[in-house]
């Protein structure tokens, strides 16, 4: 076939460039698929059900979603030529109180396991592993354990340590792990005052003393009073000591099961080998079970709520120009991809771009000295927030009016096209670099 045979003199230069780009894309995709098909053949994996399997051309990757037949574990694969291999296992961990049990669990499962009984394998990995990333994080509704490494042997060891940690931790054998990481009674001297201590307890005391941290928690808790988000998954220092050892163990028994897990593998690796290893070493030992970890939706409020919460300042600080004002809205659900992308762009265009209309309007009105916005999609129902720092409490009504008047004006007159294009370009670059 001649590439030039279909062109005529009335085709524009732009059309020509577009067609040339399409030809290049076909050549690239053909080569890519040849490599992919010879690299990730999932048809021989009898232990797994293939739910979806497709190309991800924007990521130059191949993706697959599987379910382990016996245990019910879900597995997401992203196969490509990136040598920085990534593994993550996560569990949905809703909580009904603010004792911080998800956070304490995250700390304690990494304090020794059946295969790796050392007191603190996490510290040993930090010192001796070739990892490019090593962590564990507690969110308001989930707990995740991600690792990454460019070295195959090191990566395999990291997977083994983390899988054994979350499924076979030493917490059932040694109550002192819970006491050390969660909370315990502390007595400095025989005649001294009894106090609370513990790694998570002390960590959250620090977190609760931060004005920004107080505001973030207040936004989340107040917008979702009837859901798990009304509770502090990290733990409220005043409530943490209410957690008992047996309640803590029951939390692990309930939620740290493969049926409630999501496993993620990314990068250039033998995916079939990794999946077989997961099946034989861990998942095949578990039978599927029902785990009630559903994250419920918050019903809409009938009217806007107005909440005030004090925070501590230094004795030599003035209360003038020291108030945070925050305007917050719940926006759909995190499963709506188009809405998610739209608000990422709007957040930039409305509040971060040069001459951003809401930021400009608030500063011109003298409300706050630092205006910021955020679109937090880490929860089931994302939150769009506008925050004015270094403001005053008596400016609250004007703060709301300026924001809503500005938004009404944008609805009536439209947005600056260049600001929207800048937002699109900014996020497109971020996604391609990620």
Give the predicted meaning of each segment.
Residues 9, 18-36:
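Short, positively charged and aromatic/hydrophobic N-terminal segments
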Residues 99-111:
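Active-site recognition of the HExxH zinc-binding catalytic motif
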Residues 62-69, 305-317:
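Short acidic-hydrophobic surface loop/beta-edge motif
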Residues 40-82:
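N- or domain-start disorder-to-order transition segments that initiate the globular core
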Residues 3-9, 15:
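Low-complexity, intrinsically disordered Ser/Thr/Pro- and acidic-rich segments
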Residues 91-99:
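Short pre-active-site segment immediately N-terminal to the catalytic Zn-binding motif
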Residues 35-47, 94, 108, 112-302, ...:
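Charge-rich, well-structured scaffold segments of protease-associated domains
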Residues 2, 17, 270-272:
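Position-driven detector of the extreme protein N-terminus
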């Amino acid at each position: 076939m001649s590439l030039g045979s279909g062109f005529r003199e009335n085709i524009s230069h732009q059309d020509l460039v577009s067609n040339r780009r399409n030809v290049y894309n076909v050549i690239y995709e053909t080569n890519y698929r040849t490599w992919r098909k010879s690299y990730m053949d999932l048809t021989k994996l009898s232990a797994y059900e293939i739910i979806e399997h497709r190309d991800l051309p924007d990521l130059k990757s191949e993706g697959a979603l599987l379910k382990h037949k016996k245990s019910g574990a879900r597995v997401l694969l992203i196969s490509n030529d990136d040598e920085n291999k990534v593994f993550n296992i996560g569990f949905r961990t809703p909580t009904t109180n603010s004792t911080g049990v998800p956070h304490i669990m995250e700390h304690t499962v990494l304090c020794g396991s059946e295969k790796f009984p050392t007191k603190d394998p996490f510290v040993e990995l930090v010192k001796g592993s070739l990892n490019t990333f090593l962590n564990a994080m507690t969110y308001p509704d989930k707990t995740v354990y991600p690792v990454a490494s460019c070295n195959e042997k090191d990566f395999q060891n990291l997977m083994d340590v983390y899988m054994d940690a979350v499924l076979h931790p030493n917490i059932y054998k040694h109550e002192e792990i819970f006491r050390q990481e969660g909370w315990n009674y502390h007595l400095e001297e025989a005649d001294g005052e009894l106090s609370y201590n513990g790694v998570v307890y002390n960590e959250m005391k620090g977190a609760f003393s931060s004005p920004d941290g107080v505001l973030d928690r207040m936004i989340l808790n107040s917008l979702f009073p009837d859901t798990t988000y009304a509770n502090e998954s990290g733990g409220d220092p005043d409530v943490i000591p209410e957690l008992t050892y047996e309640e803590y163990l029951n939390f692990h028994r309930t939620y740290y099961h493969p049926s409630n897990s999501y496993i993620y593998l990314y990068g250039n690796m033998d995916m079939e080998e990794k999946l077989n290893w997961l099946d034989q070493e861990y998942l095949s030992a578990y039978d599927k079970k029902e785990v009630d970890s559903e994250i419920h939706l918050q019903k809409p409020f009938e009217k806007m709520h107005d909440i005030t919460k004090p925070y501590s300042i230094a004795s030599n600080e003035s209360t003038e120009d020291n108030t945070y004002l925050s305007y917050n809205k719940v926006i759909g659900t995190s499963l709506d991809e188009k809405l998610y992308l739209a608000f990422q762009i709007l957040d930039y265009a409305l509040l971060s771009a040069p001459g951003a209309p809401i930021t400009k309007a608030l500063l011109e009105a003298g409300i706050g000295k630092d205006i910021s916005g955020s679109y937090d999609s880490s929860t089931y129902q994302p939150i769009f927030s506008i925050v004015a720092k270094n403001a005053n409490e008596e400016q609250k009504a004007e703060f709301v009016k300026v924001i809503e008047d500005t938004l009404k004006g944008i609805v009536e007159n439209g947005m600056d096209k260049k600001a929207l294009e800048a937002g699109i370009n900014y996020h497109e670059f971020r996604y391609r670099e990620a």
